[in-house]
Amino acid sequence: MRKLIFIIAGVLTLTSCKSEFKDNSDRFKVGVFEIPAGKGFVKETIIRKDSIQISQHGDHVDTLSIKWKNSFFYTLKYINPKTALQEDPMYVQINKIHNDSYDFTVKIGFSKFTQKATVHKVK
């Protein structure tokens, strides 16, 4: 009988607890973002709306389609590729979310090339 009371108390405790974690990872699907300049590349400004991403880096402006698989994985593809490399999709995995930024890893096509960086939400 005593064992049954402990089991019931445990079940009630576990089911009555409210999670304090709020998943608002969707906040990175639209807005204005920035990737700071780093070793070998210039600052990049990104504008995301619906299924389009406009990327400005240096004097170059590119338009990409963006397809979200879930809140932590999306695919980018150049709408008007200028090189053979730009014809391959880019697979982006969000690794860690911060207040207004996230760390990600990008893989180009089916190559072994990966790059890690951080995106900051500006607006």
Where are the regions a protein language model picked out?
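Short, exposed beta-strand-loop hairpins at the edges of beta-sheets
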Residues: 55, 103-114
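Tryptophan-anchored aromatic micro-motifs
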Residues: 25-40
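N-terminal glycine/threonine-rich, aromatic-flanked beta-hairpin/loop signature
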Residues: 41-69
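An anionic, turn-rich surface loop/hairpin at beta-sheet edges
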Residues: 75-99
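Bacterial signal peptide processing site
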Residues: 18-20
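C-terminal motif of bacterial Sec signal peptides marking the signal peptidase cleavage site
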Residues: 13-16
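Hydrophobic/aromatic beta-strand elements that line small-molecule binding cavities or substrate pockets
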Residues: 44-46, 63-67, 89-96, 117-121
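Positively charged n-region of N-terminal signal peptides that target proteins for export
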Residues: 1-4
